[in-house]
Amino acid sequence: MDSVLRQSKAVCPFMKKATASSLRAMTTAARPAASPCGGAISKLQVLAHRCPVMGKAMAVQSARTGGRASAAPASFVHKAKLHTGRPREAQAVEGVFTGQKAGLPPHPPVKPTTATAANPSPAACTVSGNFGTKFNYEKFYENELEKKHKDKSYRYFNNINRLAKDFPRAHMATKEEKVAVWCANDYLGMGRNKHVLEAMHTTLDEYGAGAGGTRNISGHNKHAVELENSLAKLHATDAALVFSSCYVANDATLATLGSKLPDCVILSDSLNHASMIQGIRHSGAKKIIFKHNDVEDLEKKLAALPLHIPKIIAFESVYSMCGSIGPIEKFCDLAEKYGAITFNDEVHAVGMYGPHGAGVAEHLDWEAHQRGETKGTIADRIDIYSGTLGKAYGCVGGYIAGSAKLVDTIRSLAPGFIFTTTLPPAVMAGARAAIEYQMSYDGDRRLQQLHTRAVKEALADRDIPVIPNPSHIIPILVGNAELAKKASDKLLNDHQIYVQSINYPTVPVGQERLRITPTPGHTKQFRDHLVAALDSIWTELGIKRTSDWAAEGGFIGVGEAEAEPVAPLWTDEQLGIADAVAELRAQASDEKKGVINQLLESVALEQEREALNAAEEVADAAKAAAASA
């Protein structure tokens, strides 16, 4: 620097008069506030631009480099750092699903010319002028979609319009095309429950369509407060917080906690939902994957971590694609032993399990919760619940529930909550009505469980392979993406039955399936129609039956000779059918027909829908009596 200054002072009259220290000061000083120049320049550069000699030289230099400079990324001053913008990302998962590592779909190799066009070097992207061609965005989209078509994982949407007055039927593009829907997540038919609809109609008429803003600005209202109070009551927690969906609830909560807790490590079940995986990734926290429902594997990973660092064990209670149920009590034991907190996603369980519909954690201590004794139960040991206002509750939205300080932390820090318009008042009123209804009446979930058992029995009689599980999910194994799609299409086109095929990436390649979800409305005529159609299609397409899988040694629980029978989570005693089942079995009745199918045909349960409607009338009367009191 000193040698440059000496040379400059010998040439420039201005610099001859200036001292070396003043010149150095001008090179580090910021430009004047009124300077019109772009970028950060020194006072010396400003003066040089005014010089008749240096000004011309700098103009030439600026013209030569201007193209590259204008294409360079802009530098933003005072850029806010959100927790989702951390430079460190969660470690990538090798296989989200069991067996995924060896089961990726075979994508066609990309030709070198295609790779060059689709993945240009950074220089090619930033240099303007005649330095290559512009990026072909439409071609990129086309290539990505072509991959999906070739590996048979491209998704087609069916036009399904569910009919509130003809549940569980729907019409397709035209009202004349009626189909029976067997794969909806409105598990209990609450989307057409009269109490829910009345609450929504009344609220809509009085308060209008939208909430009018975020919770912080104009969108906080009595409907949100009442709904969150009902959710906190459901889970016996201090507080709850409502989100626009459970995807957002999971993403926002895990991202916020993982980024804010110092040196946090999140231990995640290998089959966790995409929303949880995304939230962990957004958190930037270290992520450790443990084998699905494997308590021993989880403990090994916990034991290897320092006791003092924050840890979150993230899992689901019911896994929607296979129907398995998490070992919640054992996870709580490990959390307490190793200083972790638990994050329990009850999305597919709320409304479906437990005396009050609070989920699997409540169901595991049935008698205690029936008595209202929640202290010390498994449910009481959970730190964070997440759940949905859709599915069993028939509306839309998601939530978390937990301690008051936890909920307030997420409320105050999570962008996914802060910057989203509040759910419409009518939706929140309907969701609250559904929650309160299911807390006081268990007839829907009991009938749903009976219908689930009946379908599983009937499919077993036809040698149709159901992946064993203790829940309300009925995953029928196909094992081939193309066959799964064909089976779904034939059900729809030939039998007017809608069951969506489930392919990669939702499930691993080779484990493609049809997923059936019975409801209280799927009575005998619907069941018989479904089972006969599946039997016919399995024969027509040559899809493997349970005996075929058994001949090959079994696969993911289907046809495995030494596999233990899987008992339903709902016991006969909890369903109130223990005596009737014992009597039927003692009579040595028709085993091929299945005990539950016989039970549903018996005099006691012959009028299923009438009994359900009568129970609703009783609930109405109780509600009216409570209001008058």
UniProtKB/Swiss-Prot annotation:
* Record GO terms (molecular function): 5-aminolevulinate synthase activity; pyridoxal phosphate binding
Keyword Transferase recorded: yes
Q: Which Pfam families match?
A: Aminotran_1_2 (PF00155)
Record bears the keyword Lipid metabolism: no
Q: Where does pyridoxal 5'-phosphate bind?
A: S320, H348, T388, T420, T421
Query: Quick one: which pathway?
Result: Porphyrin-containing compound metabolism; protoporphyrin-IX biosynthesis; 5-aminolevulinate from glycine: step 1/1
Checking InterPro entries in the record gives: 4pyrrol_synth_NH2levulA_synth (IPR010961), Aminotrans_II_pyridoxalP_BS (IPR001917), Aminotransferase_I/II_large (IPR004839), AON_synthase_class-II (IPR050087), PyrdxlP-dep_Trfase (IPR015424), PyrdxlP-dep_Trfase_major (IPR015421), PyrdxlP-dep_Trfase_small (IPR015422)
> Which Gene3D superfamilies is this protein grouped with?
Aspartate Aminotransferase, domain 1, Type I PLP-dependent aspartate aminotransferase-like (Major domain)
Enumerate the residues binding substrate: R155, S268, K287, T506
Q: Which reaction does it catalyse?
A: succinyl-CoA + glycine + H(+) = 5-aminolevulinate + CO2 + CoA
Please give the cofactor(s) recorded in the UniProt entry for this protein: pyridoxal 5'-phosphate
Stored SUPFAM superfamilies = PLP-dependent transferases
Q: Where in the cell is it found?
A: Mitochondrion matrix
List of catalytic residues: K391
Task: Kindly list the GO CC terms recorded for this protein.
Answer: mitochondrial matrix; mitochondrion
Q: Which UniProt keywords apply?
A: Acyltransferase, Heme biosynthesis, Mitochondrion, Pyridoxal phosphate, Transferase, Transit peptide
PANTHER family referenced in this protein's UniProt entry, alphabetically:
2-AMINO-3-KETOBUTYRATE COENZYME A LIGASE, MITOCHONDRIAL (PTHR13693:SF102), CLASS II AMINOTRANSFERASE/8-AMINO-7-OXONONANOATE SYNTHASE (PTHR13693)
Function recorded in the entry: Catalyzes the synthesis of 5-aminolevulinate (ALA) from succinyl-CoA and glycine, the first and rate-limiting step in heme biosynthesis.
**Which family, according to UniProt?**
Belongs to the class-II pyridoxal-phosphate-dependent aminotransferase family.
- Protein name per the record: 5-aminolevulinate synthase, mitochondrial
